Amino acid sequence: LSFVDPDDYVHPEYAGCMKEALEKSGAELVYCYAMDIWASKGKSHTVSTETGEITVIPMNQYDWFEEKTHAVSWGVLYRQEIAKNILFQGNLKIGEDTLYLAECIHASRKIARVDRALYYYYINDDSVTNGRYSEKKLDELEAWRCVCKVFEDVPQVQRSAQAGYAIRCRLIAIKYCKDDEFMAKECSKVGTEFRKGAKELMKRWLQVGRYGTFLKTLYSYYFWNSWIRLKQRRKTYEVEI
């Protein structure tokens, strides 16, 4: 079983390569890397080095913080015995794919990763995930809270999910800090949620030597409102964590 978003497409070798990786690894699911495509900018990017190497990850070592970790349901091939008993949460408009993947991972013994960019992900500025602010944009944070709960019995994985959740809180705040409705109703709440996973996030930044990012995260932890004002004063910027 595999999912492809209507806006995206896959490499002609996607099915064969993923099936081979699943069989060789003995894993319950396998994921590949995405080729991110900004059609409006004529840019593309992937973290894949295209070696085709297959890496096997035990479920209790899955790291939601690590750069090469997968966090969405597409670009994955699932064994039927895992996927058939797990449903998408219909109450979530954004993030339901992340939660679905998390539940499948939790039900697995092993996860495999193949180092090829076989999934072509089109980034649309007007999509549900992007576009202007609405209250449903915060569904992504609810999904990540649920991901953290899924791994309550696997502390190491849960801590990595908490770091991932803190990152999403900061990204949501950066993206919508110039929206009046977001600032009036949700910004303070998002800051409170960010702090729940911020210490784990800062620990991770130090572990990987991202000292500048650690200091930025530390500043936003202690001075959330001041950090938001700094983001608001920027006329244009790339979304950064």
PLM features: what roles do these ranges have?
Residues 101, 140, 144, 162-166:
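Short runs of predominantly hydrophobic/aromatic residues within well-ordered alpha helices
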